[in-house]
Curated annotation (Swiss-Prot):
Pfam families: TPP_enzyme_C, TPP_enzyme_M, TPP_enzyme_N. Its EC number is 4.1.1.1. Its main location: cytoplasm. One of its GO terms (biological process) is aromatic amino acid family catabolic process to alcohol via Ehrlich pathway. PROSITE patterns: TPP_ENZYMES. It catalyses: a 2-oxocarboxylate + H(+) = an aldehyde + CO2; pyruvate + H(+) = acetaldehyde + CO2. This is Pyruvate decarboxylase. The keyword Cytoplasm applies. It comes from Candida albicans (strain SC5314 / ATCC MYA-2876) (Yeast). Signal peptide: none annotated. Binds 1 Mg(2+) per subunit. Mg(2+) binds at residues 447, 475, 477.
Length: 567
């Protein structure tokens, strides 16, 4: 019987699911495992600068990967604990990261040896227990016979639930053999079928609400993206012609060039015409909602109707009634078979708000502002772009822009760990290399956030991520924090860097750097056809006033300050 090592089995499983880049760092408890990655044709080891960045990179990769999956490998204790921030972010934002940790050998654990990287108390499962709180499921493997099934179980759960999973793999098991034939049976990635009786009740109730509605809207959020419901959402818009809106976390969940797209709804922080359109609706079909503070304008949704249908990844809610086990993908597919017949015969498609992204004419020498930047940038985006925006001015500014067709938006609105996007850009760029090297990956990051995770630009240079644009918004420190509290406080200051020296510092081969500070320089940059071609890694430092911020961020900062001060 043909056999392969358990280590190779793991990487072959990843390869079957089109997870062909593995992130992480080597350590003495995972070295034998890492040898096996080179035995699988088409796979590569990213080799990150540190574990936190590796976790962010894995998160970004998963958001671009067709199966919504990624993988990373770290070492016991000192390596894996550096991942906790990144893995917690992936858990909160529903991202399927397969987190494998190389742990000491089974015999060392049994003897409770006082090994390095331990707490010195013989407890080898303490870190596993920590990760249980931020993992959908986990396996601390101890037996070679059950190991393949445990690996498959964790990978399946990462896909189905779109959340991180933890696998602890002892160093002595890596080279043990398992039947190669196990790979012939693919992992079952099918979703649990909905309860037929509950689903029938859901569909009939939704159809009745649709038949009675004269002003329905569709509101799409992040989990529609994470749980692969974009095709169903697109079909629902096409079949019903209902106005559709997204949340900040839902940007790129729908085609924003669709004439039925009305904009981004952020509660009280929405544009007035968007706020009126959503809140005056008599039926709201909410798909994949994640109702966090920054995603809802500090919970300021002002629906005037009680006719709200919420489709989620593991339940559906209609008004006050919850239907556990009726997940949205199957429910939407079922609804689509009849929804057109359910529409009120007197329904006339309601006009959607129109947003004209045109800046007020200004002299070329006019200093650049956030408002001008975020209005102008939409005209430079093109179909298929992967657009990544850092927590702060970028994540709020991008809300007012329009994404082109087939774009992917990445922003950590819920978890909000500053510096996340630099690592995520590395992962997204490497995923894009595998899918389409001509697909542009565009990062907008503040000068303060950049300083937390800047090392991962080195990894981008190593892998020649020449599809990458790094826009560094230099507003001299932590503007979002200044807006919330401490405008003049020293703790919101940072040491200025010579940012344009970073690419040569990291030994980039083909690169380009620019610094812009005026309206004319931005216009010229976006008019430059050569600049639009993704043939080298580029960094553009965008000089902006310190307290200049998108209007919605200024308003959100006031709401956040109020929330923080409440007793």
């Amino acid at each position: 019987m043909s056999e392969i090592t358990l280590g190779r089995f793991f990487f072959e499983r990843l390869h079957q699911l089109k997870v062909d880049t593995v992130f992480g760092l080597p350590g003495d408890f995972n070295l034998a495992l890492l040898d096996k990655i080179y035995e699988v044709e088409g796979m590569r080891w990213a080799g990150n600068a540190n574990e936190l960045n590796a976790g962010y990179a894995a998160d970004g990769y998963a958001r671009v990967n067709p199966n919504g999956l990624s993988a990373l490998v770290s070492t016991f204790g000192v390596g894996e604990l550096s991942l906790t921030n990144a893995i917690a972010g992936s858990y909160s934002e529903h991202v399927g990261v397969i987190n494998l940790v190389g742990v000491p050998s089974s015999s060392a654990q049994a003897k409770q040896l006082l090994l390095h990287h331990t707490l010195g108390n013989g407890d080898f499962t303490v870190f596993h227990r920590m990760f249980k709180n931020i993992s959908q499921t986990s396996a601390f493997i101890a037996d070679i016979n059950s190991a393949p099934a445990e690996i498959d179980r964790c990978i399946r759960d990462a896909y189905v639930y779109q959340r991180p999973v933890y696998i602890g793999l002892p160093s002595n098991l890596v080279d043990m053999k398992v039947p190669k034939s196990l790979l012939d049976k693919k992992i079952d990635l099918s979703l649990h079928p909905n309860d037929p009786e509950s689903q029938t009740e859901v569909i009939e109730t939704v159809e009745k609400l649709i038949s009675e509605a004269s002003n329905p809207v569709i509101l799409v959020d992040a989990c529609a993206i994470r749980h692969n419901c974009k095709p169903e959402v697109a079909k629902l818009i096409e079949e019903t012609q209902f106005p559709v809106f997204t949340t900040p976390m839902g940007k790129s969940s729908v085609d924003e060039s669709n004439p039925r797209f009305g904009g981004v709804y952020v509660g009280s922080l929405s544009k007035p015409e968007v706020k009126e359109s959503v809140e005056s609706a008599d039926l709201i079909l909410s798909i994949g909602a994640l109702l966090s503070d920054f995603n809802t304008g500090s919970f300021s949704y002002g629906y005037k109707t009680r006719n709200i249908v919420e489709f989620h990844s593991d339940y559906t809610k209609i008004r006050q009634a919850t239907f556990p086990g009726v997940q949205m993908k199957e429910a939407l597919q079922k609804l689509l078979t009849t929804v057109k017949k359910s529409i009120n015969p007197n329904y006339t498609p309601v006009p959607v708000p129109e947003t004209k992204l045109i800046n007020t004419p200004a002299a070329p020498s006019t200093p650049l502002t956030q408002e001008y930047l975020w209005t102008k940038v939409s005209s430079w985006f093109r179909e298929g772009d992967i657009i990544i925006t850092e927590t702060g001015t970028s994540a709020f500014g991008i809300v007012q822009s329009r994404f082109p067709k087939n774009s992917i938006g990445i922003s950590q609105v819920l978890w909000g760990s500053i510096g996340y996007t630099v690592g995520a850009t590395c992962g997204a760029a490497m995923a894009a290399q595998e899918l389409d090297p001509k697909r542009r990956v565009i990062l907008f990051v503040g000068d303060g956030s950049l300083q937390l995770t800047v090392q991962e630009i080195s990894t981008m240079c190593k892998w020649e991520c020449n599809n990458t644009y790094l826009f560094v918004l230099n507003n001299d420190g932590y503007t979002i924090e200044r807006l919330i509290h401490g405008e003049k406080a020293q703790y919101n200051d940072i040491q200025p860097w010579n940012n344009l020296q970073l690419l040569p510092l990291f030994n980039a081969k083909d690169y380009e750097t620019k610094r812009i500070s005026t309206v004319g320089e931005l216009n010229d940059l976006f008019a430059d056809k050569a600049f639009a071609v993704p043939d080298k890694i580029r960094m553009v430092e965008v000089m902006l006033p310190t307290m200049d911020a998108p209007a919605n961020l200024v308003a959100q900062a006031k709401l956040s300050e109020k929330t923080n001060a409440e007793q």
